[in-house]
C-alpha cells in the first residue's frame, strides 16, 4: 500500500519509518530533510528502502492513505493549500489546540474532510524510540472503526495499536499533557523534589480530565494511553521538547533561546494560551495551565509553583 506522510520533522520521519516496514511511503515536507535531524535520517537510510522524499504536494496525492504530522497551528492553512479530496483517508498525528480560535484538531479537519474519513493518533511515543524499533502502544481515535483498523493494519509489529472511539478525549489528552509536561520540567528545573512533582502531575491529570469532560470526553480515555500514558512519558524525559521547555524556563532562559535550541515545535506553549482562553470563556478551572501561561508571559516560575502548591 502507498502512504504519504505530510511533515518532515522528527515525528513525521518516525511515522514514515514505522509505516515503511509494510508499505511504500513518501514524506512531503517544505523543510530540507537532507540536512534536518541528521541522526534520524541516518537511521532511516540504513533501515528502509521504501521511503521517498517528496517536495511536491501535487505529486503526493496519489496515495491510498495519508498521515499528517505537522504543527497544529499550521494545520488549517495546510488543508486549504492541499485541497484533498473529501474521500481521502487521513490519520492526523498532530497534537494541540489552535491558538487563534481555541478549537480542536478534529474541528479544523472536518471543515475540509468528512469525519468518517479521519482518524487521530495518540499515546506515549517518542520519535527516536520508534525509529529504533522499540516496542510501544498507541491509540487510534475515530468514529470509523473500519478505517481505524485499516491504519492499524499498516503498523509494524513493534507498535501495538488500540482502536478508540472517543475523538475529543484523545485530542484533549494529547494536547493538554504537553502543558503539564512543561510544568513537570519546571518542577525538576527548580529541584522541588519528587513529592512536589507527583502532586503536580496527578493534579494535572485531574485538570485535563475535567477540561475534557466539559466537552464530552470520556473519563476512561484520560486513564489510558492517550492521557496518563502520554503524560507520564512526556513530563519525565529529556526526549520531550515540552519538558525541556520547562527546564529552560526554570533556569530563567529566554523562551526565544529555548525554542531556538530545540529546533522543533513545542506545542505546549501555544496550547497553554488556547486552554487559558477557553477556560476563561467557559468558566473551567485550569490552575496549572493558567500558571504555565503566566510563566511564558514572564512570571517567576518559582512564584507560580509556589502558588500551585498552595491551591
Curated annotation (Swiss-Prot):
Ligand binding (NADPH): 11, 30-31, 95, 127, 241, 265, 267
Pfam family for this entry, one: NAD_Gly3P_dh_N
Q: What is its EC number?
A: 1.1.1.94
Query: What are the alphabetically sorted keywords of the record?
Result: Cytoplasm, Lipid biosynthesis, Lipid metabolism, NAD, NADP, Nucleotide-binding, Oxidoreductase, Phospholipid biosynthesis, Phospholipid metabolism
- Active-site residues, record numbering mapped to chain: 177 (proton acceptor)
Q: Entry's InterPro entries?
A: 6-PGluconate_DH-like_C_sf, 6PGD_dom2, G3P_DH_NAD-dep, G3P_DH_NAD-dep_C, G3P_DH_NAD-dep_N, NAD(P)-bd_dom_sf
* The reaction(s) this protein catalyses: sn-glycerol 3-phosphate + NAD(+) = dihydroxyacetone phosphate + NADH + H(+); sn-glycerol 3-phosphate + NADP(+) = dihydroxyacetone phosphate + NADPH + H(+)
State where the protein is found: Cytoplasm
Q: Which GO terms describe its cellular component?
A: cytosol
Q: In which pathway does it act?
A: Membrane lipid metabolism; glycerophospholipid metabolism
EC top class, as a word: oxidoreductase
Q: Could you tell me the superkingdom of the organism this chain comes from?
A: Bacteria
Q: Which GO terms describe its biological process?
A: carbohydrate metabolic process; glycerol-3-phosphate biosynthetic process; glycerol-3-phosphate catabolic process; glycerophospholipid metabolic process; phospholipid biosynthetic process
Q: Which residues bind sn-glycerol 3-phosphate?
A: 95, 123, 125, 177, 230, 240-242
A GO molecular function assigned to this protein is:
glycerol-3-phosphate dehydrogenase [NAD(P)+] activity
Oxidoreductase as UniProt keyword: yes
Which cysteine pairs are covalently linked by disulfides here?
Answer: none
What is the protein's known function?
Catalyzes the reduction of the glycolytic intermediate dihydroxyacetone phosphate (DHAP) to sn-glycerol 3-phosphate (G3P), the key precursor for phospholipid synthesis.
Its family remark reads: Belongs to the NAD-dependent glycerol-3-phosphate dehydrogenase family.
Protein name (record)? Glycerol-3-phosphate dehydrogenase [NAD(P)+]
Q: What is the lineage of its organism?
A: Bacteria, Pseudomonadati, Pseudomonadota, Alphaproteobacteria, Hyphomicrobiales
Amino acid at each position: 500500500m502507498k502512504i504519504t506522510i505530510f511533515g518532515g520533522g522528527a515525528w513525521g520521519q518516525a511515522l514514515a519509518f514505522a509505516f515503511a516496514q509494510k508499505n511504500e511511503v513518501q514524506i512531503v515536507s517544505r523543510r530540507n530533510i537532507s540536512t534536518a535531524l541528521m541522526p534520524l535520517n541516518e537511521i532511516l537510510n540504513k533501515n528502509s528502502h521504501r521511503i521517498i522524499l517528496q517536495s511536491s504536494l501535487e505529486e503526493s496525492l496519489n496515495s491510498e492513505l495519508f498521515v499528517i504530522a505537522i504543527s497544529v497551528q499550521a494545520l488549517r492553512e495546510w488543508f486549504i493549500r492541499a485541497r484533498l479530496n473529501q474521500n481521502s483517508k487521513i490519520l492526523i498525528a498532530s497534537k494541540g489546540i489552535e491558538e487563534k480560535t481555541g478549537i480542536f484538531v478534529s474541528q479544523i479537519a472536518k471543515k475540509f474532510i468528512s469525519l468518517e474519513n479521519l482518524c487521530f493518533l495518540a499515546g506515549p511515543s517518542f520519535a527516536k524510540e520508534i525509529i529504533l524499533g522499540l516496542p510501544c502502544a498507541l491509540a487510534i481515535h475515530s468514529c470509523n472503526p473500519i478505517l481505524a483498523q485499516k491504519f492499524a493494519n499498516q503498523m509494524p509489529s513493534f507498535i501495538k495499536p488500540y482502536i478508540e472511539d472517543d475523538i475529543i478525549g484523545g485530542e484533549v489528552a494529547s494536547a493538554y499533557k504537553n502543558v503539564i509536561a512543561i510544568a513537570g520540567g519546571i518542577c525538576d528545573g527548580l529541584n522541588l523534589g519528587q513529592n512536589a512533582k507527583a502532586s503536580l502531575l496527578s493534579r494535572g491529570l485531574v485538570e485535563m480530565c475535567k477540561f475534557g469532560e466539559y466537552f464530552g470526553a470520556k473519563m476512561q480515555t484520560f486513564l489510558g494511553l492517550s492521557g496518563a500514558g502520554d503524560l507520564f512519558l512526556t513530563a519525565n524525559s529529556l526526549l520531550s521538547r515540552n519538558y525541556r521547555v520547562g527546564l529552560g524556563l526554570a533556569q530563567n532562559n529566554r523562551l526565544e533561546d529555548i525554542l531556538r535550541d530545540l529546533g522543533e515545535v513545542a506545542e505546549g506553549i501555544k496550547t497553554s494560551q488556547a486552554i487559558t482562553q477557553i477556560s476563561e470563556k467557559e468558566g473551567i478551572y485550569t490552575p496549572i495551565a493558567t500558571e504555565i501561561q503566566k510563566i511564558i508571559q514572564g512570571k517567576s516560575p518559582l512564584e507560580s509553583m509556589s502558588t500551585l502548591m498552595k491551591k
